[in-house]
Amino acid sequence: MGGIGVLVSYAHGLLTQVELRGDLWGAVPESIQSYYTFCMLLSAIGYFFFTAFIIIYVPFDSDHIFGTFDFTLINLLFAGFIIPSVFWISMTFSMMTNPTPLLWIGIRSVLFIVGFSSVGLLGTLIFANFYKSSWLYYAGIIGLIPFCIQTMILDALVWPIYFQK
């Protein structure tokens, strides 16, 4: 459900800001844009695998998350990358038309919240006491790796360097 909200926000932004959508790259060199695109594709595929693993194998009444946390931790981590992601594109288009330091701080905060949440989910899946014999567990972990690279490295660290140039 949350992933659909992100897709709808992106579609709305791209369809209503046609003249600005090419500027979303900022000054990211064309030589690395293909890496972004490839990583985005792997991230989207990975999202389905790690989400499927959680839905199928992690009981909602689970206390297997480090022996003390329940499923609320998973919900918070998902919310940490879904909810801010919904706001990123509209905030970025606003930054293009009416830039302010506060808006830039907001965009950077959104990107770091998403990045840290995805890395937190990867850590949770690796170190928690879940059923790990399923191929879906390993597919989920493998899928989370490009997701973390995309959100924490490419989006939160690399893109901001080039966006405001």
Report each predicted region and the residues it spans:
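First transmembrane helix
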Residues: 1-3, 51, 112, 120-127
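Membrane-interface interhelical loops and short amphipathic "cap" helices
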Residues: 15-33, 92-105, 157-165
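Interfacial helix-start motif at the membrane-water boundary
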Residues: 29-48
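Alpha-helical transmembrane segments of multi-pass membrane proteins
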Residues: 2-18, 153-155
